[in-house]
Curated annotation (Swiss-Prot):
One of its GO terms (biological process) is translation. Keywords: Chloroplast, Plastid, Ribonucleoprotein, Ribosomal protein, RNA-binding, rRNA-binding. Part of the 50S ribosomal subunit. This is Large ribosomal subunit protein uL23cz/uL23cy. The lineage of its organism: Eukaryota, Viridiplantae, Streptophyta, Embryophyta, Tracheophyta. One of its GO terms (molecular function) is rRNA binding. It comes from Amborella trichopoda.
């Protein structure tokens, strides 16, 4: 589960849980096929649809001595499961 970072709990994502849709942030370099494979393999569920978008806020700049770097950019995935399947709640990232 290297590509999946953490579950997202917002008003919209909690509302989508009623439609059997789960929201999580993933690494921007991960493909849809990889994410689908990881979720089906790890949780034992069937994925029927996946929607994704890049978060509008770019990675925050961070200085490391004379070099300027940036934090990782993330992509948000909304994963729709077949009826009858569910994912146990993932651990929420503390900020």
């Amino acid at each position: 589960m290297d590509g999946i970072k953490y579950a997202v709990f917002t008003e919209k994502s909690i509302r989508l849980l009623g439609n059997n849709q789960y929201t999580s942030n993933v690494e921007s370099g991960s493909t849809r096929a990889e994410i689908k494979h990881w979720i089906e393999l790890f949780f034992g569920v069937k994925v029927i649809a996946m929607n994704s978008h890049r978060l509008p806020v770019p990675g925050k700049g961070r200085r490391m001595g004379p070099l300027m770097g940036h934090r990782m950019h993330y992509r948000r995935m909304i994963i729709t499961l077949q009826p009858g399947y569910s994912i146990p709640p993932l651990i929420e990232k503390r900020t």
